[in-house]
Curated annotation (Swiss-Prot):
Leader peptide range in chain numbering: none
Molecular function in Gene Ontology: ATP binding; metal ion binding; phosphoribosylamine-glycine ligase activity
Gene giving rise to this polypeptide: purD
Native source species: Pyrococcus furiosus (strain ATCC 43587 / DSM 3638 / JCM 8422 / Vc1)
Full protein name: Phosphoribosylamine--glycine ligase
GO biological process: 'de novo' IMP biosynthetic process; purine nucleobase biosynthetic process
Length: 439
């Protein structure tokens, strides 16, 4: 049996763990709190901060694992892959240097510029408030202001959304320069965002089905940005507003990225996630993530037909082949504590009827919750509906939520026809009429 160490204890990692066990792995987990879903399927469980590299390596050596699979971004930034590889333990996940695609936004933008990656945005990095203000005034169009490190997607502010105008953008950018020493300013791109995740063996990429995330806290895409309140994917692995040509361009961006990383001496092995904006001119890369999306990992792993252990071994050995996914639609809805993300309640027990959820045909994924169903303050559970069409998948996920009771909060509109029509409408306003893909 292949012994696999999984680092991380969120919903994404529960989905990864289930896929590894289904592929025949003997699973070992290290995370800062015990995920009840992972605890049920793991041979052993080590409690430690995922960024405590020495501790992670210690567990890996104690359990004599064959390889590691890294779930979240923080341990990648901490260099957990480098440390494991130094001890002869291969990993699915990029080294600290390769993970800069996510962990250092300025480096990533400069890398894209150096290598002429298609779909890149206009950007500037500033450490001088005066220069920054002059540039924004001269640019004269709406901008996006981004902090440079890992922010869990929460520090990015866009003119016309979180910022009233470029004047407010200058104030926020100045605050970030004072706080972090630097700030990243980009042109604003209008359109609809989508997620394109690929497996990478260092030289080539293999695509997964596209997904679309719902980052805003509240229905109708308003409110603060969260880690993601849910996501959907379509049975044809595209999205209703994406053409085959858009898909090919986005894939080219990711393939060229991996080729350029190899050329620069940082072979990228693991999962690469491109967050794209579909603009009127085609897909623009908003940012990279150096790991699976959470929730989008749950969508794609729910319909993975091939064996994740074998895929992982091929990533490590550098000989990836195409990967098969079933032609099913998926809807993932996250359940969070009331008050999330700004002021979530914690320490309260909720009722979860797992048998009834299964009877609805849904899967239950555990995240920030303990084995007594006590809320730990972040997204707690995800319910997953899988069916031949999106309506049916959404119904399954929605009906499962009835069997979770307590001070919870979720978005009813994730994966609904209305919410998707809204996105199609945005694209039609930018591109004119087009043939919509069925989902």
């Amino acid at each position: 049996m292949v012994k696999v160490l999984l680092v991380g204890g969120g919903g994404r990692e529960h989905a990864i763990g289930e896929a590894l066990v289904k592929g025949g792995a003997e699973l070992y987990v290290v995370s800062k709190h015990k995920n009840p879903g992972l605890a049920r399927i793991a041979k052993d469980y080590g409690l430690a901060r995922e960024t405590d590299v020495e501790k992670v390596v210690e567990f890996a050596e104690k359990w004599k694992v064959d390889f590691a699979f890294i779930g979240p971004e923080a341990p990648l930034e901490a260099g957990v892959v480098n440390a494991l590889e130094e001890r002869g333990i291969p990993a699915v996940g990029p080294t600290k240097e390769a993970a800069r695609l996510e962990t250092n936004k300025a480096w990533a933008r400069e890398f894209m510029e150096r290598n002429k990656i298609p779909g890149r945005k206009l950007f500037r990095v500033f450490d001088d408030p005066k220069e920054m203000k002059e540039w924004i005034d001269e640019f004269g169009k709406p901008v996006v202001v981004k902090p440079l490190g890992l922010t869990g997607g929460k520090g990015v502010k866009v003119v016309g959304y979180q910022l009233k105008d470029n004047e407010e953008a200058k104030e926020y950018a100045e605050y970030l320069i004072r706080k972090d020493g630097k700030v990243l300013i980009e042109e604003r791109t209008d359109g609809v965002e989508f997620t394109f995740q690929v497996f990478s063996d260092g030289k080539k990429v293999v695509p997964m089905p596209l997904a679309q995330d719902y980052p805003h806290a509240y229905e109708g895409d308003v409110g603060p940005i969260t880690g993601g309140m849910g996501s959907y994917s379509c049975s044809n692995h595209l999205l209703p507003f994406i053409t085959k040509s858009d898909w090919e361009k986005a894939l080219e961006t990711l393939q060229k990225t991996v080729e350029a990383m190899y050329k620069e001496g940082y072979p990228y092995k693991g999962i690469l996630y491109g967050q794209f904006m579909l603009s009127k001119d085609g897909p623009v890369i908003i940012e990279y993530n150096a790991r699976f999306g959470d929730p989008e990992a749950i969508n794609v792993l729910s319909i993975l037909e091939d064996n994740l252990v074998e895929i992982s071994e091929r990533i490590i050995d550098g000989n990836l082949r195409d990967v098969k996914f079933s032609n099913m639609a998926t809807v993932v809805k996250y359940i969070a504590p009331q008050g999330y993300p700004e002021n979530p309640i914690k320490g309260v027990r909720i009722e979860v009827n797992e048998d009834k959820i299964r009877e609805e045909g849904a899967r239950l994924i555990f995240a920030s919750i303990d084995e007594n169903y006590t809320l730990l303050g972040s997204r707690a559970l995800a319910v997953v509906g899988v069916s031949e069409n999106l309506e049916e998948a959404e119904k399954i996920a929605q009906s499962a939520i009835r069997h979770v009771k307590g001070p919870i909060f979720y978005r009813k509109d994730v994966g609904t026809r209305e919410s998707i029509e809204k996105r199609i409408k945005i694209m039609k306003s930018l591109r004119g009429d087009f043939d919509v893909n069925s989902c």
